[in-house]
Amino acid sequence: DVECLASVQIETRQIAQMDSKDMDHATWFVLARAVLAACADEAVAGIVITHGTDTLEETAFFLSQLFTPSKPVVLTCAMRPATALSPDGPQNIVDALCVAANPSADGVWVVAAGAVHRPTQVAKVHPYRTDAFSSGETGPVGVVEEGRLRWLHPAGEKSFARSPSTAASRQIEGSSNLGTAANALLARLESNGLPRVEWVVSHAGVTPAAVTTCLMAGGEGGAVRGLVLVCTGNGTFHQCLTKPLRDAEACGVWLRRSTRCIQGSIVVGATSVD
C-alpha cells in the first residue's frame, strides 16, 4: 500500500495508442485539450500522462511551453514491457501518482526511475536502461522515496524547479480565464500549424546541402520557418555552412544554435562565434 494514494480516486482516459516515435502535432493538440479540461475540473488534483519513452521529453517540453498549469501534470513511462521479468512501469506510475497528488508540485514534470525532472532539462540518454532519463548537469529537481516526494532544492528555490514562462504562457496566465485563453491559443495553433523547424548538424565533411535541402523541401509542414544548428563545441560550425545560413536568414528564416556536447551550453564570449 502507498500512503499518499490511500484516499486518491483514479480515473483513466485514453487519448491515443501509438508508438511514441510516431508522435505528431495533432496528437499533441488533443492531449493538450485533455490536460486543460482536467485542470479546469475542480475535482481533479493532478494529471498523470503515460507516454512512450522515445519522444516523452518533446511532449513534456511542448506542454510546459504552452501554459503553466496550476496543478501537477506528470509524464511517466516504462523502459521494459509489462511482460518483462521485472517491469519498471508499475513503480513509475505509482511514483508519478504520488507527485501528481502533491499540491506543491504544480507544473509539468517528468517522473522516471524515482527521479523528478524539469521538462526543459530532461532527455532520454540511454536506449535500454531503466534509468534512461537524465537532466544533465542540473540533475533531477526531486525524488520519490517510499511514496513521498522530496524536493532536492530548498522551498525558497522552488521557482528554479518550475518551467520558465514563455510569451504564450504569460499571456494565458494573465487572462482571467486560463481555460478559455489556452484553448483559444490551441485553436490558433491547430488552424495555422506549428512553425516548421528543422535541425542541421555540423560535422566533419558536411556540405551546404545540409541547409539548402531543408530550405527547398516542401511537404505537409510547409516552408521552413526556422533552423536549429547543432554545432560543434562552443557554438562553432563548418565554414561551408556560413553562406547558406546567411542566405536563409536574409530570407526570413530564424536561426538558433545549440551544441552537440552532452553537457554544458553555449557561452557567448571572446572565444565564441557571433
What are these regions (language model features)?
Residues 41-56, 221-234:
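Short acidic, glycine-rich surface-loop motifs adjacent to enzyme active sites
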Residues 1-38, 263:
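ATP/NTP phosphate-donor binding region
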Residues 75-153:
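Internal gly/pro-rich beta-alpha loop/helix module
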Residues 49-51, 74-77, 109-114, 201, ...:
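Short beta-strand segments
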Residues 49-71, 237-246:
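Short Gly/Thr/Asp-enriched flexible loops that form oxyanion-binding sites at enzyme active sites
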Residues 29-42, 214-220:
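Short, well-structured alpha-helical segments in soluble
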Residues 229-274:
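C-terminal non-catalytic interaction/assembly regions of soluble proteins
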Residues 1-6, 118-234:
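Accessory alpha-helical/coil subdomains and C-terminal extensions
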